[in-house]
Structure formats: structure tokens, C-alpha cells
Swiss-Prot record:
It comes from the Eukaryota. In plastids the F-type ATPase is also known as CF(1)CF(0). This is ATP synthase subunit b, chloroplastic. The chain crosses the membrane at residues 35-57. The lineage of its organism: Eukaryota, Viridiplantae, Streptophyta, Zygnematophyceae, Zygnematophycidae. CDD domains: ATP-synt_Fo_b. Belongs to the ATPase B chain family. Keywords: ATP synthesis, CF(0), Chloroplast, Hydrogen ion transport, Ion transport, Membrane, Plastid, Thylakoid, Transmembrane, Transmembrane helix, Transport. It is found in: Plastid, Chloroplast thylakoid membrane. The keyword Membrane applies. It is a single-pass membrane protein.
Length: 188
């Protein structure tokens, strides 16, 4: 460092003595240049300004520390909120999965119930169809029976008309009278 000061001083001396520096030059006389006055003023400023500067720097430091502390608190709050949000997200995912599984189970239950109800309806319809068929069959049989009976009666009447003459008619009357008399004697 001393070498540097010496070279700077040599340069200043050279510039002062050089013919190029006739209008410009450095005054190396300390008393003429008020260097002492400047040093005193700077010293007073440093001595008394040190408190102000220290206060300003301390205030600035405190502001920076408070800002950092606030930023850290906000970071912690944001981290907590993020963790809570992740927790709620996981809970929502779990709830959605539970709802999906329950929905599938409920859907399967309802499917089975619908199949069972359809089977029951089909059985009921089959039973109803069978009952209707039996009823119609019975009705048809009854109609056939009635027609056969009517035709048999008509045939019997026709046969009676053609075969029934006076002698046969008298024999039948006598036969029935005999039956009635035998019944009367059994009753007495």
C-alpha cells in the first residue's frame, strides 16, 4: 500500500512540475488547502454522526429483521395452510372413493333387487297366464260339456219321439207306478 501512495505522490509532483500543468496543479501545502479543516469537519461528522448513523442502521436492521420474521411467519402459515389443504384433499379423495365404492355396492344391490323384482313379475305373469289358460280350458270344457249334454238331450228326445209309442209309454207309466208303490210299502 505504501508503494502505491508513493507512486501517486510521484505522479502528482510530476504533474505539478510539468509544463503541461501550468493552468492546473495540486497544492501539497496542507495549511493552504484547508485539509486540516476538512479533516476536523469530517471527524466531527463521524463522531456525532456515528450515533445517528448507528440509529439509522439499527432501525434499518430492525426493519429488515421484522420483515424477515413476518415473511417467515407468513411462510409458516402458508405451509400450514398448504398441509391442511393437502389433508383436506386426501380426505376428499378418500370420501370420493368411499362414495364410489358405496355407489357401486348400492348399484349392485339395486341391480339384484331389480333382477329379483323382474323374476317375481315374470313368475307372477306366468302364474297369471297359466291361471288364465286353465280358466279358459275349464270354460271351453264346460261349453263342450253343455253342448254335448244339449245334443245328447236333443238326441234322446228325438229318439224318444221316434220310439215312444202308446204301448211303450203305458209300460213306462206302469213301471214307475210300481216303483212308487214298492217305495211306499218300504216306507210303511
Amino acid at each position: 500500500m505504501g508503494e502505491r501512495i508513493k507512486s501517486t505522490m510521484d505522479l502528482l509532483i510530476y504533474l505539478q512540475n510539468s509544463h503541461l500543468a501550468t493552468g492546473f496543479g495540486f497544492n501539497t501545502n496542507l495549511f493552504e488547502t484547508n485539509l486540516i479543516n476538512l479533516a476536523v469537519v469530517i471527524g466531527v461528522l463521524v463522531y456525532f454522526g456515528k450515533g445517528v448513523l448507528t440509529t439509522l442502521l439499527n432501525n434499518r436492521k430492525e426493519t429488515i429483521v421484522n420483515t424477515i420474521r413476518d415473511a417467515e411467519e407468513r411462510y409458516q402459515e402458508a405451509t400450514e395452510k398448504l398441509n391442511k389443504a393437502y389433508t383436506r384433499l386426501e380426505q376428499a379423495k378418500a370420501k370420493a372413493e368411499e362414495i364410489r365404492v358405496n355407489g357401486l355396492a348400492q348399484m349392485e344391490i339395486e341391480k339384484q333387487e331389480l333382477i329379483k323384482a323382474a323374476d317375481e313379475d315374470s313368475k307372477r305373469l306366468e302364474d297369471s297366464k297359466n291361471a288364465t289358460l286353465r280358466f279358459e280350458e275349464q270354460r271351453a270344457i264346460e261349453q263342450v260339456r253343455q253342448q254335448v249334454s244339449r245334443l245328447a238331450l236333443e238326441l234322446a228326445l228325438e229318439t224318444l219321439k221316434t220310439r215312444l209309442n202308446r204301448d211303450l209309454h203305458a209300460q213306462m207309466i206302469d213301471y214307475h207306478i210300481g216303483l212308487l208303490q214298492s217305495m211306499e210299502s218300504v216306507i210303511d
